[in-house]
Design a protein with these regions (language model features):
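A short, glycine/Asx- and small/polar-enriched loop/turn
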Residues: 11, 143-145
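P-loop NTPase catalytic phosphate-binding loop
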Residues: 24-128, 145-148, 154-166
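Conserved alpha-helical scaffold flanking the Walker A/P-loop in AAA+ ATPase domains
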Residues: 115, 119, 133-142
Length: 166
């Protein structure tokens, strides 16, 4: 069983467990992103509007990059803005021939990270100036698209940096 949710009730804790994960798998073409959620399994969604971070870990050859490619394909069908970083110049770097904002060279990676951060801070300031802005709400509440920084092989990037840059 997989623990998929934990909710505190008045006088007890309610756990939601996912059993028979193999039967809950979906095909790649069934992975979809809509309404701030991305479908990962029949009954499992990543609610990126609520939890905008994801760490994918696993052994060599375990399918991490193919999983990321699947996420990218689903997100391309939304109004999201994607930035793809692949310091090993491997599978994700190949996307540069069919889409924008794909980086694999050290200088380009650093520039993308800096630009992404600056745009994030600027967007945050612009959001605070909007009429319908509310503290604690995010871009989705304001009807803005999600922005994703997708980083494959982060450890390889850290190794690529010198001590000063690190």
């Amino acid at each position: 069983c997989e623990l998929t949710d934990k909710e505190l009730k008045d006088s007890y804790v309610e756990y939601t467990l996912l059993y028979d994960t193999i039967a809950s798998r979906i095909s790649i073409d069934e992975v979809e992103a809509k309404d701030g959620k991305l479908r990962l399994m029949k009954n499992v969604w990543w609610e990126y509007d609520k939890l905008p971070h994801m760490l994918i870990a696993g052994g060599t050859g375990g399918g991490k990059t193919y999983f990321i490619l699947t996420l990218i394909e689903a997100l391309l069908h939304t109004d999201s803005k994607l930035y793809i970083l692949d310091p090993k110049n491997a599978d994700l770097a190949d996307l540069g021939s069919v889409m924008a904002n794909v980086y694999y060279r050290k200088e380009d990676l650093l520039s993308c990270i800096e630009t992404f951060y600056e745009e994030m801070m600027k967007r945050s300031e612009e959001m605070k100036q909007m009429k319908n802005y509310k503290t604690g709400k995010n871009y989705a509440y304001l009807g803005l698209p999600a922005h994703f920084l997708i980083f494959d092989e982060y450890v390889a990037f850290m190794e690529m940096l010198g001590t000063k840059e690190n």
